[in-house]
């Protein structure tokens, strides 16, 4: 009896495999979105940069007026980098709220799950193969030992 045969199951559901290079596009921050947003620069509180962060207005807060979505960003000490990152975050939030196309984050999560499943399958197959080889070797060794004992008692 094969060991892995009893564990297999066949499903009629179609499995959609995701390719890393075929992910949905990242949401873009458009000039129309820019016109609908208000931007504030705040004194920072937490984040990298130490005392300098507490003294300057590097924290960016974007508010999308039609939806009321507010995004804050203080990932770096640079105001310009924070502005860029805040716009990317807002575009992602708007895409998630409108749900017009499949989310890139969901596709990435599914891709990671798919990779883990594949890795697990390979690992299980590898260890089953090792187990089978060890079992066969043990049976051969026992058969040789039995044959040796028979030879000894025949004499």
From Swiss-Prot:
The keyword Mitochondrion applies. Signal peptide: none annotated. Residues 1-17 form a transit peptide. It is found in: Mitochondrion. GO terms for biological process: mitochondrial translation. Keywords: Mitochondrion, Transit peptide. Residues 125-155 have a biased composition (Basic and acidic residues). GO terms for molecular function: peptidyl-tRNA hydrolase activity; translation release factor activity. Residues 113-124 have a biased composition (Basic residues). InterPro entries: Mito_Transl_Release_Factor, Pep_chain_release_fac_I, Pep_chain_release_fac_I_sf. It comes from the Eukaryota. Pfam families: RF-1. SUPFAM superfamilies: Release factor. Residues 111-155 are annotated as: Disordered. GO terms for cellular component: mitochondrion. Belongs to the prokaryotic/mitochondrial release factor family. This is Uncharacterized peptide chain release factor-like protein YLR281C, mitochondrial. It comes from Saccharomyces cerevisiae (strain ATCC 204508 / S288c). The lineage of its organism: Eukaryota, Fungi, Dikarya, Ascomycota, Saccharomycotina.
């Amino acid at each position: 009896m094969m060991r892995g045969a009893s564990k297999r199951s066949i499903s009629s559901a179609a499995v959609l495999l995701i390719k890393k290079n075929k992910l949905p596009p990242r949401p873009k921050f458009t000039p129309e979105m820019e016109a609908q947003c208000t931007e504030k620069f705040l004194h920072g509180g937490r984040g990298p940069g130490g005392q300098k962060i507490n003294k300057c207005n590097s924290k960016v807060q974007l508010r999308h007026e039609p939806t009321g979505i507010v995004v804050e960003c203080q990932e770096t000490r640079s105001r310009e980098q924070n502005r860029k990152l805040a716009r990317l975050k807002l575009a992602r939030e708007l895409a998630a709220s409108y749900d017009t196309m499949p989310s890139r984050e969901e596709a990435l999560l599914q891709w990671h799950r798919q990779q883990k499943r594949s890795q697990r399958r390979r690992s299980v197959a590898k260890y089953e193969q090792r187990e089978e080889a060890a079992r066969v070797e043990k049976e051969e060794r026992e058969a040789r030992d039995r044959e040796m004992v028979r030879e000894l008692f025949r004499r």
